[in-house]
Amino acid sequence: MSSPSPSSSSSDHPSSPAPVPAPPGPVPEAAAASRASRAPVYLGGFVDVFSYPKDSRALYLNPADVGAHLPLPGPIPLNVEHLQEAHVGWTLGLHLTRYGLFCVAVITAEEFFTLLDRLCAASSVARTRADHHLPPNPTLEMLHTWLPELSLSSIHPDALPGAKGGDTPIFQHVALCAMGQRRGTVAVYGESLDWILSKFTSLSPEERGAIAEGYASPAPESLPEPHFTCSNEILMAKAIDAGFIKNRLEILKTDKGVAEVKAPTYLKASVQGLPANLDEVDSARGGEDPPTAAIATTPHPATDATTMNQQQPFAAQAPAGGCEDLISVPRSTFMTMLQTNLDTMRQTSLGQRFGQPIDAPAAPPAQLRVPPPAAPFPVHPGYYPAPYHPQVDAQAQYLPYVPLPPPGAMPFAPPPLPDFYKYGGIPAPGYSPVAHPARPGKRKRDCDEEFEGPLFPGEIHKDVQSLSKSIAALQSELKDIKNSQQFPQPLPQPQLQPQAQPQPQPAPQLYPAPPQAFYHPAAGDQGYYVRYLNPFQASGGVPCAPGPQGVGEPQAPQVTVTHNGHQAAPQAGGGATGATAANVEQRQPEGGEACGAQQQQPPQPQPQQQQQPQQQAFVEASTKPSQISQLQKIFCEELLNKT
């Protein structure tokens, strides 16, 4: 339940008391005579239902504390939306009942009645009655439409016990409002107080009699004239604020049920408005519109009465919960639904109109018939293979011409053949040109039957199926390469040759593989020239190929040469002799692979020789082919072949 606007809330918190008009005094005879022409409007309703829960603690009233300040010493003001300048009448009294605190008031402001008459002439909801058993009364209908509830302005409930006997009034005024903070505070307007009390079933007969007897004694003519000086702009602003109260009509129905108000009344809690009749508004104002405006707004006299007679019974027979069957749909959503329904209906109508196929003729047209068989004898090229009639009187075979049926009769007609498929007007056998690969030996991965559809701008791409085939081929090649890496082929070991000066040496010298320190030579060590050689074609060395132990010819021992002096050049066919130039140290190779004998000889002492100046050596290390480079090459070739 949403809280009402601040304009319609009751001022229950303790604050500085508002100036209260002076008690009623003697009324001049002229003023009383002017008000005698218009009957006063009475109203009654609960300003608080004790048993109904409230939204705030300040809204609760203790019946014992309230009863101590009743009855009122005199009438209190009755205004609109708690506005002091909108004083429209007087509150005759507050009566404490078993169900709640009941209020009885009267409206006597002549300026306010004039404003109600002008508003009712322009309001469609005010002129729509929920029950036609009641006589039309524009003033009562407008009051129920605009100000359907009551709001009591009093001091805070906590200050009620100690406020008795003070100078501050306990109840300041009662306001007519669009929505009160307390539930069940709906007002019933009428011209008779007894008729108003009869609409509240929550009041017992004894309570109705006590209220009518106690508050009917002061005559409305004896009360002073209210000073209604509020501008229309302020009242309009309050009405606009009330229009933004959430679920206002639903709350108004709840208040009507809480107060137990029975029909018929002028209450507009369940009434839907009709379009306003501008002619009645103009007649009430006493003005005339231009002729063009009158033509645009005046309905046709033949249809005006009929339309109003059809609309009023509909509004009268509408149930109280009729608005619950309606839902609010945005305009865009409604237009979308409407367009969808129209499209569906259009397709359905077209299907019913052209959906049933038309019966084709018994004989197909000549254009779709099978051509006659060719003659058994050859025909000159370029002519139709029609049968040859050597007899002059022989009649050729003529086929009657049958026109083509309409398009709807043959939905599955074969499409026309292209020109290059025809030979002499007769379909020729299919021909597909031989595909010429971009390079010799290219593997064919595309099928001739595959056909790519039309491509639009931005869709120039290869078919997904062909790309998947290329990826599968690449995966198979990668798998083959991985398998080949698991079982690599033996590579020849590098044979080392020293980069020596061209000096004659007496004895030949072999230079096998250097130790591990060769790749990171220390200061003073001799570098080497590394080159991969074929051990069977190299000169000046012993063939040294890896192989299983004990198989083949005996291998020569692996030697390590330490250069401390003159270096000897290798000789073709030389053996492992000439220890005078360098000390040769024989050792057993690690890992089970050896070149030479399996026995290890003890080291021999090295004779000291005169050191030669260190020579600069160059290393040329040829790398193995990279597998990554090979994969990149294959991938690039595949991309080039696909483009």
UniProtKB/Swiss-Prot annotation:
Coiled coil: none annotated. Signal peptide: none annotated. This is Capsid scaffolding protein. Residues 1-15, 290-306, 607-616 have a biased composition (Low complexity). The keyword Phosphoprotein applies. Keywords: Host cytoplasm, Host nucleus, Hydrolase, Phosphoprotein, Protease, Serine protease, Viral capsid assembly, Viral release from host cell. HAMAP family: HSV_SCAF. The lineage of its organism: Viruses, Duplodnaviria, Heunggongvirae, Peploviricota, Herviviricetes.
